[in-house]
C-alpha cells in the first residue's frame, strides 16, 4: 500500500484529448505504474476533496526510439481517467471544466 496519496498521482495529462474530456467531467492523470484503481480513487478524493464515480486506467508501452548512439526506449507509463460526480470540479487546468 502506498501511504501518501501524492505519491500515486504524478501529474495531470495536458493534451487535446484530455481538454475535450473536461466537458464530460473526466480528468486524466499520469499515475504510478503499480497503483491500482482503488488507490487512485482514494488519492484523488483526498487530494482534491471531490467524489469519484469511476476510474479507468490505460497502460502505455514505451516507444522504441532511434538515437545518435543506437536504439533507446521511452519509459512506459500508466494513465488514469477519473470521472467525477456531477457538480464536482478540479481546478488544475484553465479549461472549460475548471
From Swiss-Prot:
One Pfam family named in its UniProt record: Ribosomal_L23
**Protein's UniProt keywords contain rRNA-binding:** yes
Q: Which GO terms describe its cellular component?
A: ribonucleoprotein complex; ribosome
| The keyword Acyltransferase is assigned to this record | no
Single annotated GO MF: structural constituent of ribosome
Question: Which InterPro entries does the entry mention?
Answer: Nucleotide-bd_a/b_plait_sf (IPR012677), Ribosomal_uL23-like (IPR013025), Ribosomal_uL23/eL15/eS24_sf (IPR012678)
Biological processes annotated in GO: translation
Keyword list (alphabetical) reads:
Ribonucleoprotein, Ribosomal protein, RNA-binding, rRNA-binding
Identify the NCBIfam families for this entry.
Answer: PRK05738.2-4, PRK05738.2-5
Q: What is the purpose of this protein?
A: One of the early assembly proteins it binds 23S rRNA. One of the proteins that surrounds the polypeptide exit tunnel on the outside of the ribosome. Forms the main docking site for trigger factor binding to the ribosome.
The subunit structure is:
Part of the 50S ribosomal subunit. Contacts protein L29, and trigger factor when it is bound to the ribosome.
Which PANTHER family has this protein been placed in?
A: 60S RIBOSOMAL PROTEIN L23A (PTHR11620)
Family statement = Belongs to the universal ribosomal protein uL23 family.
Q: What is this protein called?
A: Large ribosomal subunit protein uL23
The species this protein belongs to is Frankia casuarinae (strain DSM 45818 / CECT 9043 / HFP020203 / CcI3)
Amino acid at each position: 500500500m502506498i501511504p501518501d496519496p501524492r505519491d500515486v498521482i504524478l501529474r495531470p495529462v495536458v493534451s487535446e484529448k484530455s481538454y475535450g474530456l473536461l466537458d464530460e467531467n473526466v480528468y486524466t492523470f499520469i499515475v504510478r505504474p503499480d497503483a491500482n484503481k482503488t488507490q487512485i480513487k482514494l488519492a484523488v478524493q483526498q487530494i482534491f476533496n471531490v467524489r469519484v464515480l469511476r476510474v479507468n486506467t490505460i497502460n502505455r508501452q514505451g516507444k522504441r526510439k532511434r538515437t545518435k548512439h543506437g536504439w533507446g526506449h521511452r519509459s512506459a507509463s500508466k494513465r488514469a481517467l477519473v470521472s467525477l460526480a456531477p457538480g464536482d470540479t478540479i481546478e488544475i487546468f484553465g479549461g472549460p471544466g475548471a
